[in-house]
């Protein structure tokens, strides 16, 4: 019985727009959300005093925070549509890192992007 509240997909099960996404984008997505367009985020670390981690506004397949989703998705910032999330993430990555490969290299070093 699956007790995970978020549906997750393997890389082969994803519906990919326009024939595919870069492998670095897929790698980041799988590390961030397991491919779930409805995934929320809970910080694993607490304050060190037994207090659990805090929720963040990160959401979706690429775990973009709310302010970033609003910037790149506008009124659709809460959309669970993969194509919209991927498009927004691609614009964010291009603006911040220049490419998905550069974003992946940053993620490997910092465990976020």
Predicted features along the sequence, with ranges:
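Peptidoglycan cell-wall recognition and remodeling modules
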Residues: 20-113
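N-terminal secretory leader/proregion of peptide precursors and effectors
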Residues: 1-20
């Amino acid at each position: 019985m699956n007790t995970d509240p978020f549906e997750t997909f393997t890389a082969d099960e994803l519906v990919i727009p326009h024939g595919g996404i870069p492998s670095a984008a897929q790698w980041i997505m799988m590390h961030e959300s397991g491919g779930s367009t409805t995934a929320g985020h809970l910080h694993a670390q607490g304050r060190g005093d037994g207090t659990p981690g805090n929720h963040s506004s990160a959401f979706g397949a690429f775990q973009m925070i709310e302010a970033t989703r609003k910037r790149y998705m506008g009124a659709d910032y809460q959309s669970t549509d993969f194509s919209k999330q991927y498009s927004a993430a691609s614009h964010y990555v291009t603006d911040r890192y220049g490419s998905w490969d550069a974003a992946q290299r940053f993620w490997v070093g910092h465990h976020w992007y």
